[in-house]
Structures are given as C-alpha cells and as structure tokens.
Amino acid sequence: MNDEASKQLTDARFKRFVGVQRTTFEEMLAVLKTAYQLKHAKGGRKPKLSLEDLLMATLQYVREYRTYEQIAADFGIHESNLIRRSQWVEVTLVQSGVTVSRTPLSSEDTVMIDTTEVQINRPKKELANYSGKKKCHAMKAQAIVTSQGRIVSLDITVNYCHDMKLFKMSRRNIGQAGKILADSGYQGLMKIYLQAQTPRKSSKLKPLTAEDKACNHALSKERSKVENIFAKVKTFKMISTTYRNHRKRFGLRMNLSAGIINHELGF
C-alpha cells in the first residue's frame, strides 16, 4: 500500500498497518524532506519514488519484514534502489534524533533492566551466538527503562553472552536512580548498587518461604513495565522473528525502533 492509499485508512488502521501513528509518520516525513533538500540543494534527477512512498516502504519493511524484492515490486521500483534509499532513511532518522538519547537520572527515578533475544540464522561460528535458553542462535539487546516507560539506554551485543556480563560491558552508570529492579539474570547487581533489587533465589536446603514468594511476586509485578516496552518494540516483525540482515546494522535498527516507541509515548 502506498501513501495515497493509506490516506483512506482510519488512524487506528494506519497504526496497525504501518506500525507508527499518523502524526509520527508526518513528523518523520518532515525530517526526511529537510535532509533531502540539503542533500540535493543543487538539483538533480527527480526520484521515481516519492519521499512519502519511500518512508512508507521502509516502515513496511520493518513492520512486516517481507523481502525487499516483494516491497519494491509493490511500489514499481528495482530492489537495489529500495535497499539503497531505505538505508538512507534509517540513518537520517537516527541522526535526526529518532533514537534512544541518554537521559540523566535522579533519586526519584525507578529504573528496570532487562534483555531480550533476537533469533538469527545459524552463523559460521556457531558457538559465539548459541543461546542455551532458547536452543537457537541469537543476539541480545539490553534496555534500561524508567517506571514511566521511557527507554533511557539500549545496548546491543552481536555475540551471545550472559545478562550480567552484557551489563558490565555496557558500563552504564545508573547509581543516581533511587531504585533499580532486575530479574534473576542480574544476580550480583546488589553488590554494585545498594538500591538494586533482584528476586530471592531458593536452594535445596533453603526453599523459599511465603514471604520470599510474596516479595518475588511484588518485584515481578513492579518490573513488568520493561516487558511491556519490549512487547511494543517487537510489534516490528524484524525484531520479533528471525533477523535475516547483516548484523552490523542491527543496533541502528533496534535504536530506531526504540526511538519511535519513546516518541509515541511522549518522551
């Protein structure tokens, strides 16, 4: 569906089809028009695909994750043309600020840390990307989210690693936050930050008491916000299914998706 046909859709159907709100689409389009005018200030040949349709095709690729060949055929252009121009759209939007920007934290903030896995095709060096948890090859993305739902940082690792190891490699300083919530993958975080909370673990000799289970349940309920944010990011099928593209652009696309979520939540 091109931009002209999408004007017949209601706002709710537009959001379901493209993955972003209509107002967000218009703001992204304004950014692209400004960048295009600067790039082609001296004129040049008029492109076959308008900026409106180019943005629509790019968002359809991230939202539906069909092949470039299929989407290019829908818009009547060559596949290589769409690939080249879609990559320009992604880079331009991220450079313009549609990404995760670092936000200073205060003692009144509550932050939640979690990671998600994105499955990839089997690489040449299998063991570097093998996830024993999901029994597949995967990459990891770590997000730090405030209690209001704002993504304050996003870290990517192409090679699979433990959650706590990824946090240490990211070197994120969140000590200013009043409370830090994490799941059991971040055992040991309380040794770094005294305000951190992780679930209480049981052992064969020391099973969980009723109080421990109640604390774990309350912690899980409080940190559900980060799970909701990951669910929003994974409405883009590129993130929720097997990632087929070059892994070097995964971080850029993940930041773009998270930036769109932040923008639509009003941050």
Model regions: which residues?
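Short helix-loop boundary/capping segments at the starts of domains
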Residues: 34-38, 63-67, 91, 95
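Short, well-ordered secondary-structure "scaffold" segments embedded in the functional core
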Residues: 51, 68-267
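Active-site-flanking structural segment that lines cofactor/substrate pockets
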Residues: 39-53
